[in-house]
């Protein structure tokens, strides 16, 4: 090998080493860059993961805090409610104790008054005994005076004088007792009734026997009548209601005395008008649907009335009968509204007297329950109501209340008396009831006839829409004290022979005129 070849070999080695070093350096730097980038990516990802984890932990902590706060607030609210309920119960107990205390005080006052009354009666009896002894003495003297008369003449004279004196004493006694009873009872009764009326509000009513259905146009009248009147005949036959189609624009009148059948006809007709298909088969289908809808409506009405009054445990069939009262009127007054009003009034009066409020409301709501079916079953609404409540196992107090609220039988409980009183208040309220002109005129004529049939009556006049009768008497036949007796007798006869809402005032007028002429 020559020197040149060695030099070339050395140069080649050096160059190869340099190239290898350069290549290796580049590769190493690239690997470092890759490693650096990878490390930075891992660090960045770790930071993001740490940040995400941190946010999740913060959110979890906030949620836990909110949940804990909600639980604490709920628990605090429950405790507040419990404390409030306890306070309400304590307050209610205090009110109950106050009410019982007032009741006891009233009863003590009543007992004191009764004791005073008994003492007065004893004094009166003693006075009457003294009067009787004096009368015997007078009669003995009278017998001695009339000894010269015949036996028959003496007997007639004594009987006449005794009769006149007894009539006078009877008139005085009636007047005294009437004044005493009014003075003691009216004050307490008015207070109770005023409190009850203040807590009761009701609408004025009017009786109706027709319903009006609006039509989209007058062409619908022809479709309702149908070919040769078959549609209207079918509807009238199925519902028992008369359809009156006249010149009234866009309206059909439904006439009938049964409000339930009239309402069924109205619902069915409105459905037919809305559907547009009016023919006998469709009419039958809609009437059947209306009946089912009406039954459900009656049931819901009864349940709502029972719920509003806070009553429980009433038989479902009885609740349905309560709902039927919404479609029954008495002197133009809706019987369901009247029954609810009576129930509320009876409840208020019962609370004032310390009686069972719930039982009073129950008796008040059911007192006219017989009117729900009195047009379907024979008998008065009182008899029917007693049968229904007995059948559905109502309380004996409720049954007696129904039987006695018109005075047919004796009231056996205070609640029965309260319901009868509430019934009178509801019926006598101005605007509560109306009556037909024929019944009104007949009642006025009967009222005047009762007064005119009494001896010594010159003329009588029914005024104030029949709520007062003024009786003018002959002064030479009726004395002032006899006028008191006459007013009492007329009042009793009116109570026995007439049916009327509220009360009737009897006024007897005795006028004496003395006329002379100066010459």
UniProtKB/Swiss-Prot annotation:
Pfam families with a match to the protein in the record: HD, KH_1, RNase_Y_N
Gene3D superfamilies linked to this entry: Hypothetical protein af1432, K Homology domain, type 1
GO biological process terms, semicolon-separated: mRNA catabolic process
Segments forming domain HD: 335-428
Subcellular location: Cell membrane
Transmembrane parts of this sequence: 3-23
RNA-binding in keyword set: yes
This enzyme's EC code(s): 3.1.-.-
Domain KH: 209-272
Cellular-component GO terms for this entry: plasma membrane
Keywords: Cell membrane, Endonuclease, Hydrolase, Membrane, Nuclease, RNA-binding, Transmembrane, Transmembrane helix
Membrane topology: Single-pass membrane protein
PANTHER family with a match to the protein in the record: RIBONUCLEASE Y (PTHR12826:SF15)
Record-stated family: Belongs to the RNase Y family.
Stated role: Endoribonuclease that initiates mRNA decay.
Name of the protein described by the UniProt record: Ribonuclease Y
Organism: Lactiplantibacillus plantarum (strain ATCC BAA-793 / NCIMB 8826 / WCFS1)
Name of the gene encoding the protein in the UniProt record: rny
């Amino acid at each position: 090998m020559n020197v040149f070849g060695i030099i070339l070999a050395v140069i080649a080695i050096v160059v190869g080493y340099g190239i290898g070093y350069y290549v290796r350096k580049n590769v190493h730097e690239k690997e470092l860059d890759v490693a650096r980038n990878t490390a930075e990516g891992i660090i960045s990802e770790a930071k993001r993961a740490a940040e995400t984890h941190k946010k999740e932990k913060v959110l979890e902590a906030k949620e836990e805090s909110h949940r804990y706060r909600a639980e604490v607030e709920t628990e605090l609210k429950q405790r507040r409610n419990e404390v409030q309920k306890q306070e309400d119960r304590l307050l209610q107990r205090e009110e109950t104790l106050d009410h019982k205390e007032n009741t006891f005080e009233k009863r003590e006052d009543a007992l004191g008054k009764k004791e005073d009354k008994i003492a007065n009666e004893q004094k009166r009896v003693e006075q009457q005994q003294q009067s009787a002894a004096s009368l015997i003495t007078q009669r003995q003297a009278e017998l001695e005076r009339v000894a010269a008369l015949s036996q028959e003449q003496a007997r007639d004279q004594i009987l006449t004088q005794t009769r006149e004196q007894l009539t006078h004493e009877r008139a005085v006694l009636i007047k005294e007792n009437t004044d005493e009873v009014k003075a003691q009872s009216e004050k307490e009764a008015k207070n109770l009734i005023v409190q009850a009326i203040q807590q009761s509000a009701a609408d004025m009513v009017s009786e109706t026997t027709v319903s009006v259905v609006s039509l989209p146009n007058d062409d619908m009248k022809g479709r309702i009548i149908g070919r040769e009147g078959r549609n209207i005949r079918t509807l009238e036959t199925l519902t028992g209601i008369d359809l009156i189609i006249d010149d009234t624009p866009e309206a059909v009148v439904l006439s009938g005395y049964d409000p339930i059948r009239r309402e069924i006809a109205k619902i069915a007709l409105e459905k037919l008008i809305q559907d547009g298909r009016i023919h006998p088969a469709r009419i039958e289908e809609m009437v059947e649907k209306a009946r089912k809808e009406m039954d459900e409506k009656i049931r819901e009405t009864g349940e709502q009335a029972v719920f509003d009054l806070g009553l429980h445990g009433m038989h479902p069939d009885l609740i349905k009968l309560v709902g039927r009262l919404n479609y029954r009127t008495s002197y133009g007054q809706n019987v369901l509204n009247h029954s609810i009003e009576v129930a509320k009034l009876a409840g208020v009066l019962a609370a004032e007297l310390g009686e069972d409020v719930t039982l009073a409301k129950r008796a008040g709501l059911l007192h006219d329950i017989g009117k729900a079916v009195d047009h379907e079953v024979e008998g008065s609404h009182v008899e029917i109501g007693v049968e229904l409540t007995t059948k559905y196992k109502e309380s004996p107090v409720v049954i007696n209340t129904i039987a006695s609220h018109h005075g047919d039988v004796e009231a056996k409980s205070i609640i029965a008396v309260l319901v009868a009183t509430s019934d009178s208040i509801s019926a006598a309220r101005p605007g509560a009831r109306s009556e037909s002109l024929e019944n009104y005129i007949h009642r006025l004529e009967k009222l005047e006839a009762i007064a005119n049939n009494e001896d010594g009556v010159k003329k009588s006049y029914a005024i104030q829409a029949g709520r007062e009768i003024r009786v003018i008497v002959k002064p030479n036949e009726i004395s002032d004290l006899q006028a008191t007796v006459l007013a009492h007798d007329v009042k009793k006869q009116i109570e026995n022979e007439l049916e009327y809402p509220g009360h009737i005032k009897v006024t007897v007028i005795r006028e004496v005129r003395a006329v002379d002429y100066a010459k």
